[in-house]
Design a protein with these regions (language model features):
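Acetyl-CoA-dependent GNAT
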Residues: 4-67, 72
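Conserved acetyl-CoA-binding loop-helix of GNAT-fold acetyltransferases
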Residues: 77-90, 115
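Short glycine/proline-centered loop/turn elements that form peptide/ligand docking sites
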Residues: 81, 85, 106-109, 126-132
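Conserved GNAT acetyl-CoA-binding A-motif
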Residues: 92-105
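Conserved catalytic-core motifs of GNAT/GCN5-like acyltransferases
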Residues: 101-103, 119-136
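Short beta-strand-to-coil "C-cap" segments at the C-terminal boundary of structured domains/repeats
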Residues: 138-142
Length: 142
């Protein structure tokens, strides 16, 4: 088998993944995959023209995955992260999402997320590097 970089836009990997995953869904559930189950989001906060906070992720089926949440150090402690988490929960409820998932490293914001109702469901030590661990967290919407 030959491995090579993608140089053509005829079939991008996303198209391939979608085709294969749709086939798996339809085989498992014995029905067509509904439209609108996958979407991405990017939310940001600005102070004038300055970007001071951002959050992005994906929604697949009934789960939201927060990929990144960052607050400019000059703006930390002003509840911007809390506003994003509250907004994500409200938005998730509106569109029928039942759980919000995220990961955070040992030197990041585990306690912040616990304060906002997230639970740790997994932990890997020395990931992504020695001396650092990653927490896997979930918030179940009621």
């Amino acid at each position: 088998m030959t491995h090579y970089p993608v140089e053509s836009t005829e079939l991008m990997p996303e198209d391939f993944y979608e085709r294969v995953f749709t086939h798996g869904y339809e085989t498992y559930f014995n029905q067509p995959k509904p439209e609108g189950l996958d979407q991405s989001f990017i939310w940001q906060m600005k102070d004038g023209e300055r970007l001071v906070a951002a959050m992005d992720g994906k929604i697949r089926y009934q789960a939201m995955k927060i990929e990144n949440l960052a607050i400019d150090p000059d703006y930390q402690g002003q509840r911007l992260g809390s506003q994003f988490i509250d907004y994500a929960k409200d938005y998730a409820r509106q569109i029928g999402v039942t759980s919000i998932l995220l990961t955070t490293r040992t030197y990041q914001a585990k306690d912040f997320h616990v304060k906002h109702g997230f639970e740790v469901y997994g932990f890997l030590e020395d990931v992504p590097m020695p001396g650092v661990g990653v927490y896997y967290m979930i918030y179940r919407l009621k």
